[in-house]
Amino acid sequence: MIVTLKDGSKKEYAEAKSVIDIAYDISEGLARAACAGEVNGEVVDLRTVIDSDCELNILTAKDEKGLAVLRHTASHVLAQAVQTLFPDAKVAIGPSIDTGFYYDFDCPPFSRDDLDAIEKEMKKIIKKGAKIERFTKSREDAIAYFQEKNEPYKVELIEDLPEGSEISFYSQGDWTDLCAGPHLMSVKGVKAFKLLSSSSAYWRGSEKNAMLTRIYGTAYASKDELKEHLEQMEEAKRRDHNKLGREMKIFTTVDVIGQGLPLIMPNGVIMMQELQRWIEDEETKRGYIRTKTPLMAKSDLYKISGHWDHYKEGMFVLGDEETDKEVFALRPMTCPFQYYVYKAEQHSYRDLPLRYGETSTLFRNEDSGEMHGLTRVRQFTISEGHLIVRPDQMVKEFKDCIALAQYCLQVLGVEEDVTYHLS
């Protein structure tokens, strides 16, 4: 068996080896720091046994994927601590996220004093140093297990899985959770953590479901890294746009108007007008032509474009398909509208590329628990562009789009740490 490491070097073994055994074979220091392995691109437990040729990367908390495993384990320690102190709490889900981790519980809200007590209990659990073990059950046995423990949310998750599925569990001491993993080998690996806040969240993000209590936390490999992160969070609070925007009289919100529907104050209108003129001028320089399309359309348009099937739950729908002859919806995006601008005329291939630009007001029915300031709202204005191009023009036009985005971000001073997502 030949194992190819991240640096291209190779290790040859006569028999199967676990990821942690290979880590020790590389160096004891690496093994002590290891959080997980990445085998042929898949993140796995350190206890995973490798029995065939593969590419292997040993992940530590310095790696984004390794840190995610550490934080996922921290969420399990959190859940164990909560159920130790609050035995009636029902567990839902507890993933790692970009900034840390969270876990959702069906129980009354937690106070800051509660969070402090939970932190202390987590430290006790970590000090005991229980090993983390993975095991599996059949779908039927897994459902019976959580029914006996009166954990309805776990039962629901398992029931959504196909019949015949093998269900994985992770246990630490006498506490067990449903989980696909991976996790650290011991709770001792959670060395530096902090519970940050508690809030409400709907089960599975739907307002039709039960309201749960969510605890947010973060975790790092060292106390110094945690301290640095917490200091950055405090600085971010001081610079929070939601706070500064109100202080500078740029925008405000009013309960009677509704969540995610900000009032733009005169100072904010001036800023928006300046930004709009600037970006439209930049687009014009680059050959964009302006369009102005309706704020709503019949459901037929969204069915043709495919948005109805995929985004209907996130749209503001006017009317009832069962009783009304026509059903309308406020637009969540502009693309199908600008496509019909193109279709309104005949075009030659010589007319291409056609670059349509529009400053669009869009509407999206966001969950109330997801909204904050201007970062997640139900009505917003963006600069949108859609291009009709020939195949031989695609590469250049794509590069020009990225160049425009980079230029705008650079002018606004936010060009660093930008990630581009293609959909």
Locate the predicted segments by residue:
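Residue-level marker of alpha-helix boundaries and capping positions
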Residues: 13, 269-270, 396
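Extended, charged alpha-beta segments that form solvent-exposed binding/catalytic grooves
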Residues: 362-423
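Short, conserved phosphate-binding/catalytic loop or strand-edge motifs used
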Residues: 95-105, 418-423
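Auxiliary tRNA-acceptor-end handling modules of aminoacyl-tRNA synthetases
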Residues: 51-69, 90-94, 102-371, 375, ...
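Short secondary-structure junctions
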Residues: 28-31, 84-89, 284-289, 411-415
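Hydrophobic alpha-helical membrane-association signature
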Residues: 74, 118, 275, 397-401
